[in-house]
């Protein structure tokens, strides 16, 4: 899967408007890769990304009739809810950022340096980013 992230001509309004003025220049990508341990239910998921000198912007559109949104706090385990994930690797072989967003706006952000799965399901080595880090 290949996706080209466009430079934002204007800062997107952060109002969740899929067809907002800034998003018109962003390519739409359909996400059809699901984790093997997930259920057989696969909702329709699309995303758009933009960037500028300081920020990566993203918006997801999910069409689903089964939505779970229980977790509401920062760094909550939103993977137990209906959620989407976004990964960014700033430098090859130096770790990656893992962003997980729930249907109600709660999110989890980790910087993963060793993705080896432990028996708990967690990655072997990661740092939870604070709200101040963002």
How would you label these PLM feature ranges?
Residues 1-134:
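Structural preference for beta-rich elements and adjacent junctions enriched in aromatics
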């Amino acid at each position: 899967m290949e996706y080209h992230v466009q430079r934002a001509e204007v800062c997107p309004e952060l109002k969740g408007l899929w067809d907002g003025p800034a998003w018109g220049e962003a390519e739409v990508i359909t996400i059809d890769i699901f984790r093997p341990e997930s259920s057989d239910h696969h909702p329709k998921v699309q995303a758009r990304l933009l960037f500028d000198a300081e920020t990566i912007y993203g918006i997801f559109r999910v069409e689903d009739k089964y939505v779970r949104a229980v977790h509401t706090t920062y760094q909550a385990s939103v993977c137990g809810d209906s959620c989407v994930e976004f990964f960014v690797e700033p430098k090859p072989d130096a770790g990656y950022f893992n962003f997980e967003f729930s249907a109600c706006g709660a999110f989890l952000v980790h910087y993963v340096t060793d993705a080896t799965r432990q028996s708990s399901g967690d990655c072997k080595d990661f740092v939870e980013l604070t709200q101040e880090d963002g």
